[in-house]
Amino acid sequence: MNKLTPDEAIDLAYDIFLEMAGENLDPADILLFNLQFEERGAVEMVETSENWDQEIGTLIDPDAFAEVWVGLVNDKDEMDDVFARFLISHDADNREYHVIWKE
């Protein structure tokens, strides 16, 4: 299985985010994201967490998925406001994904 490159994972997550954010985020968060994204926005691939089973109710192989966060960074370049966390399968033939939205 060819793993997603970081750029591919980021592009996929951002496309899904843009498509689904309106249905899953609070209007105030959407406004904040839109106003701040150019200056502070970030979409980053991070090390795949092993606690996704607690979030989605099923065990996953961290090596089979990419984890991507969409949010805003602070002045220390740390993402301190995460709007969505994505878990995206590396399997192009069965592109499975899960999203945890900001509450």
UniProtKB/Swiss-Prot annotation:
Q: Name one Pfam family in it.
A: DUF440
Organism's domain of life?
Bacteria
**Record-linked NCBIfam families:** PRK05094.1
Instruction: Give the similarity note.
Output: Belongs to the putative dsDNA mimic protein family.
**Purpose:** May act as a double-stranded DNA (dsDNA) mimic. Probably regulates the activity of a dsDNA-binding protein.
Q: What is this protein called?
A: Putative double-stranded DNA mimic protein APL_1348
Write down the species: Actinobacillus pleuropneumoniae serotype 5b (strain L20)
